Design a protein with these regions (language model features):
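Active-site-proximal cap/loop segments of hydrolase catalytic domains
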Residues: 1-178
Length: 178
């Protein structure tokens, strides 16, 4: 294993984590692919976030002119959005989002993209027009092709011809022999 060439991939919560990883440890990770990531859990599914990440409660007590107390409750998500980590990011991030994703709204990715652009960071991004949270058919093939090319370029320094990786080709050959 070459510890100087480490890549990470994740989808959905894993997409959040792969982007967080390359932003948190930019000298360790050489490449990351993040698809459909919930990069900003302040706008993601509140029930999921509260159960899996937790919520902090801040109570502020004030008194009015008559001495009557009132309390104000403020809640915040414990896990930081990737936008806050983006300042550490150096290189190697490829982002994907489905244009009609109703599970993780594309705004999660666009908020991260906005911060990366403002910080003049180099990254790549694709919006898959016909995709919801999962990528299927032509979009899935396109996604896989771009992901493998990204890893080949950054981890293997291979900028040669198209990368044609069919993970099932051996299985397909075996089925044809039967």
């Amino acid at each position: 294993i070459d510890a100087t060439k480490v890549g990470i991939y994740g989808h959905s919560g894993g997409g959040f984590m792969s982007a967080a990883a390359i932003c948190t440890y930019p000298d360790f990770y050489s490449a990351a692919v993040s698809s459909a990531g919930n990069h900003d859990n302040r706008i993601y599914n509140k029930g999921f976030v509260e159960i899996h990440y937790g919520v902090d409660e801040k109570v502020t007590t004030t008194k009015d002119s008559l001495g009557v107390e009132s309390k104000t409750y403020d809640y915040s998500v414990r896990v930081r959005p990737n936008q806050e980590l983006a300042k550490n990011y150096k290189h190697g991030l490829l982002l994907f989002t489905g244009a009609i994703d109703q599970t993780v709204n594309p705004a999660n990715t666009l908020r991260l993209v906005d911060v990366l652009i403002k910080a003049d960071k180099d990254f790549d991004m694709f919006v898959l027009p016909k995709c919801t949270h999962g990528f299927f058919g032509e979009s899935e093939s396109f996604f896989e092709h771009k992901m493998w090319r990204h890893f080949a370029r950054l981890l293997l320094h291979d900028n040669s011809a198209d990368c044609d990786i069919d993970l099932n080709k051996d299985m397909i050959k075996d089925e044809r022999r039967r």
